[in-house]
A protein has these predicted regions:
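Helical segment within the ABC ATPase nucleotide-binding domain
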Residues: 163-176
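ABC-family P-loop ATPase nucleotide-binding domains
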Residues: 79-135
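The feature captures the beta-strand-to-loop junction immediately N-terminal to the Walker
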Residues: 30-35
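Conserved ABC transporter NBD signature motif
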Residues: 56-71
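Helix-to-loop junction immediately C-terminal to a conserved catalytic motif
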Residues: 48
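Conserved structural motif at the start of ABC-family nucleotide-binding domains
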Residues: 2, 17-19, 72
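Catalytic Walker B motif of ABC-type/P-loop ATPase nucleotide-binding domains
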Residues: 148-152
Length: 208
């Protein structure tokens, strides 16, 4: 279970997150809905341990995320803005991920790369935006995360690939009881895939 309690964050005297409470049950998919600027990306950065709230707490099955390297091994993150080192291929990135994540699954990586028809030897800089999303998905899912954080994960993907991505996520939730947070502004798509939905506006949870 992921639990966020009374989380608040201010940048340059501007509140970005305010007294935020949210719970993601184990083995469920939680959809976080909000327009651009609602605070979705900032919240995900806190949940991944990249930022620390001014107040409040974020725990994963009772463990705080901040400065917890052991817990971060169990968290998969696909941000909205992807970064890959210049000149690296998907195979190069595989070497980095497999050396860092203890639960790396080589078969899972190759299975997903084949599913998306990605050339592991090709330079990622030659990939389209959608292909880069698929590459990130292959890498992150192969770490076998217990918790998956996705920031606008389906932007730039065609309908067929979207279905493949969602199927892989749903299968892992069913098979491994993975817990998932998905942020999006697409209410219709979230309603069809998520167990729970929260609506975020100006850093506050309006409705769950």
């Amino acid at each position: 279970m992921i639990r966020i309690q009374k989380l608040s964050k201010t940048f340059d005297r501007t509140p970005v997150l305010t007294d935020l409470n949210m719970t993601i049950q184990t083995g469920s998919i939680y959809g976080l809905i909000g327009v651009n600027g609602a605070g979705k990306t900032t919240l995900i950065k806190h949940m991944s341990g990249m930022l620390k709230g001014d107040e409040g707490s974020i725990t994963y099955d009772g463990e705080p995320i901040w400065e917890n390297d052991t817990l971060k091994q169990c968290i998969g993150l696909i941000p909205d803005e992807l970064y890959f080192p210049n000149g690296y291929s998907l195979r190069d990135m595989r070497s980095i991920y497999s050396g860092f994540y203890e639960n790396w699954n080589e078969d899972r990586f190759h299975q997903l790369a084949g599913l998306f028809k990605l050339d592991e030897k090709a330079k990622i800089r030659t990939f389209s935006k959608g292909m880069k999303k698929q590459a990130a998905f292959c890498l992150v899912m192969a770490t076998m995360p217990a918790y998956l954080l996705l920031d606008e994960p389906i932007d730039g993907l065609d309908p067929i690939v979207r279905k493949l991505v969602w199927k892989a996520i749903v299968d892992d939730v069913a098979d491994r009881r993975m817990s998932v947070l998905v942020s999006s502004h697409n209410v219709k798509e979230m309603e069809g895939i998520c167990d729970y939905i929260g609506i975020l506006s100006h850093g506050r949870m309006l409705m769950e």
